[in-house]
Amino acid sequence: IGALTHVGQSEVIAGNGAGQRFNDAGATKILCGQQEQGNVALTERCEGLAETFSGEVVIEFMGLDADTSEQQNTINAALAADTDIDGFMGVGPVITLSGLRAAQDLGRDLTIGGFDLTPELIGEIEAGNIAFTVDQQQYLQGYMPVLLLFLNVTNQNTLGGGLPILTGPGFVTPDNAAEILALSEVGTR
């Protein structure tokens, strides 16, 4: 189709990294909550998690982001029904926050991880309420293609060798959350 390369994140590789982080945190059973049915990328995030996580992963649709009350109630019910769940992975920022609220409602101490960035999510990471979020570095996903096209047109450069140029996964943790939040406020993260 004439594409030079793909600049982005492999959702499976990103999920793999999340699985390793849950292993490091000592989790044994994770609920991987999805906010859209049939979205292949979100499914790949959970499947990648399951590939590297040494415990059990339960993948469930938890309701749409548009109705966070229903979403949180669905997560509450899943957590109440299975007290062995000690980790929650949201495959987007809104559902990650819904998972945190559900755990808080039930008084459950879960290791919580997520995907993507919002100021509220980064704030919860900085506060220590969420362990991490996967950062696909969307700024790079916009910046790098423009740079690559410019270099191709003006200097006949190509990068990637026909393979994707990955922008993630990066991880936002309590160690770097304040800096990432500051960078997001100026529009580069």
What are these regions (language model features)?
Residues 1-189:
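A residue-level marker of the well-folded mature domains of exported/periplasmic proteins
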